């Protein structure tokens, strides 16, 4: 990386474009690798309950390193942190290609992802400012959604052709992300010289957790976003199990196409939320959250591809409308209390803890032999009830 300071704050500067390209390739690799590795587990005759466990080891890395990755991003040049993180992802993907246990390789990818997250968001504010920062965040989210769509589909389609070829493609995507990171200017570390004592770092992180949890609005946001992303990742794995049972389709590509419909819907729903919901009217998003659970239950009863696509598109639209206002609320209130970086780190911990819990319950249901359709119906009903309870709780808190 070349030594430089921020002189060009345009969202089309070389540094900003390098960040966006690196983010696209890294997110593409993440999504393609998930479905390629799931195909590998199927090819090697791992039991069905092992599929969500794969994601659990990834999420576990996020939780384990949550107190430390924020400080790491602030203590070094963020472009360099991103490069090292993508290097860890590359090592994990390459290891799986070379026969390393897929759970071990995927854990390494999870460690890289945990380190990558705060750096990729934090660097935007160092490369641009003001209104351009909003546009830069928009570019980041657009590249991420595009990577989710293309990566998920590519992982499934390539795995149907050749599993190892799919895994190699993932490793190449991570290598491209590392190369893109080389073109990010080396910026001054935001907060160098901080204490690296584990006790001090952990204490600082959990004090931020306490501050956010004691505030009614941020607590409401943390619970809502945690439930949403926990449900979202569980739905991903439910689709892999549900498609052969409900639709009679046994390829690796169809679940990725269905997942892509959810991502498209999220984009539409997020756009609607931006126009219809403000920080003062966040509660408008709650009916959409309840409807997510209702539609998931209806979806689980389908036996044809076309209505399945339509219902997943609707689930994504409801999800985007639900989660975007909650994210904005946490970022705004968190910035004023513990700082934006700490707020994101705490949110990551909450979301990944919810993912771990929901994936654990899903794995248990599969292990004891609950049918995929029954899991989907129960999952949808429980999610709708959980969001309804959260809404009632929030209204009572607001009335005090």
Swiss-Prot record:
MF term (GO), any: lysophospholipid:sodium symporter activity
SUPFAM superfamilies reported for this sequence: MFS general substrate transporter (SSF103473)
Keywords carried by this UniProt record: Cell inner membrane, Cell membrane, Lipid transport, Membrane, Transmembrane, Transmembrane helix, Transport
Keyword Transport: yes
Membrane topology: Multi-pass membrane protein
Location (main, coarse): membrane
UniProt-annotated location(s): Cell inner membrane
UniProt-listed Pfam families: MFS_1
Transmembrane segment boundaries: 19-39, 53-73, 91-111, 139-159, 164-184, 195-213, 227-247, 257-277, 281-301, 304-324, 352-372, 373-393
UniProt-listed InterPro entries: LysoPLipid__transptr_LplT, MFS, MFS_trans_sf
GO CC list: plasma membrane
Family: Belongs to the major facilitator superfamily. LplT (TC 2.A.1.42) family.
Listed NCBIfam families: PRK11195.1
Role of this protein: Catalyzes the facilitated diffusion of 2-acyl-glycero-3-phosphoethanolamine (2-acyl-GPE) into the cell.
PANTHER family: MACROLIDE-EFFLUX PROTEIN, MAJOR FACILITATOR SUPERFAMILY (MFS) PROFILE DOMAIN-CONTAINING PROTEIN
Record-given protein name: Lysophospholipid transporter LplT
């Amino acid at each position: 990386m070349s030594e430089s300071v921020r002189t060009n704050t345009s969202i089309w500067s070389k540094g900003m474009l390098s960040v966006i390209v690196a983010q696209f390739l890294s997110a593409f690799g993440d999504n393609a690798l998930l479905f390629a590795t799931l195909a590998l587990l199927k090819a090697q005759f791992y039991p069905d309950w092992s599929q969500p466990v794969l994601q659990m080891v990834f999420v576990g890395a996020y939780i384990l390193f949550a107190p430390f990755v924020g400080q790491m991003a602030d203590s070094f040049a963020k472009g360099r942190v991103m490069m090292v993180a993508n290097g860890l992802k590359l090592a994990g993907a390459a290891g799986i290609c070379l026969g390393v246990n897929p759970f071990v390789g995927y854990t390494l990818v999870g460690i890289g992802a945990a380190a990558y997250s705060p750096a990729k968001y934090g660097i935007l504010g160092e490369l641009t400012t003001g209104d351009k920062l909003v546009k830069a965040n928009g570019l980041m989210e657009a590249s991420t959604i595009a990577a989710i769509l293309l990566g998920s589909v590519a992982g499934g389609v390539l795995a149907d052709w050749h599993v190892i070829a799919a895994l190699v493609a993932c490793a190449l995507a991570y290598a491209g992300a590392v190369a893109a990171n080389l073109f990010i200017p080396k910026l001054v570390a935001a907060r160098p010289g901080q204490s690296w004592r584990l006790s001090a770092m952990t204490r600082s992180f959990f004090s931020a957790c306490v501050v956010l949890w004691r505030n009614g609005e941020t607590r409401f946001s943390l619970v809502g976003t945690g439930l949403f992303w926990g449900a979202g990742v569980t739905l991903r794995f439910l689709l892999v199990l549900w498609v052969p049972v409900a639709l009679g389709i046994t390829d690796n590509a169809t679940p990725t196409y269905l997942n892509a419909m959810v991502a498209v819907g999220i984009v539409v729903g997020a756009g609607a939320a931006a126009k219809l919901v403000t920080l003062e009217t966040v509660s408008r998003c709650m009916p959409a959250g309840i409807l997510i659970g209702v539609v998931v239950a209806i979806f689980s009863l389908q036996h044809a591809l076309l209505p399945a696509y339509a219902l997943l598109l609707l689930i994504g639209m409801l999800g985007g409308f639900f989660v975007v206002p909650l994210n904005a609320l946490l970022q705004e209130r968190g910035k004023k209390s513990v700082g934006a970086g700490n707020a994101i780190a705490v949110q990551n911990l909450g979301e990944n803890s919810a993912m771990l819990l929901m994936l654990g319950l899903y794995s248990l249901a599969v292990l004891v032999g609950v049918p995929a359709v029954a899991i989907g119906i129960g999952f949808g009903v429980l999610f709708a009830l959980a969001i309804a309870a959260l809404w009632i709780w929030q209204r009572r808190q607001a009335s005090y």
